Amino acid sequence: MLLQAFIFLLAGFAAKISALMTNETSDRPLVHFTPNKGWMNDPNGLWYDAKEGKWHLYFQYNPNDTVWGLPLFW
């Protein structure tokens, strides 16, 4: 009985790991926000709009370089 529970638990973990490994952008974090390209400053201004049912996250962003510099966008 204990062995069956362990195998069931192990199969569940294997399925989750498999799903994570099939991520098309495996070199990017799966939990933390990152821009598609460029540099971003620390995120701030996270808020939930209950009317729209959406989360909003604000950060400084430079799409043209991987370091801080102008132009910066919000």
Swiss-Prot record:
* Gene3D superfamilies noted in UniProt: Glycosyl hydrolase domain, family 43 (2.115.10.20)
Active-site residues (renumbered): 42
The EC number(s) this enzyme carries: 3.2.1.26
- Record's GO cellular component terms: extracellular region; fungal-type vacuole
Q: Which GO terms describe its biological process?
A: sucrose catabolic process to fructose-6-phosphate and glucose-6-phosphate
Q: What would be an example GO MF term here?
A: beta-fructofuranosidase activity
Q: What class of enzyme is it?
A: hydrolase
UniProt xrefs under Pfam families: Glyco_hydro_32N
Reaction(s) catalysed by this chain, per the record, are:
Hydrolysis of terminal non-reducing beta-D-fructofuranoside residues in beta-D-fructofuranosides
* Residues the record lists as binding substrate: 39-42, 60
- Which residue positions carry a glycan here? 23, 64
**Superkingdom of the source species:** Eukaryota
Q: Which family does it belong to?
A: Belongs to the glycosyl hydrolase 32 family.
Its protein name is Invertase 3
Give the organism the record lists.
Saccharomyces cerevisiae
Write the lineage as a comma-separated list. Answer: Eukaryota, Fungi, Dikarya, Ascomycota, Saccharomycotina
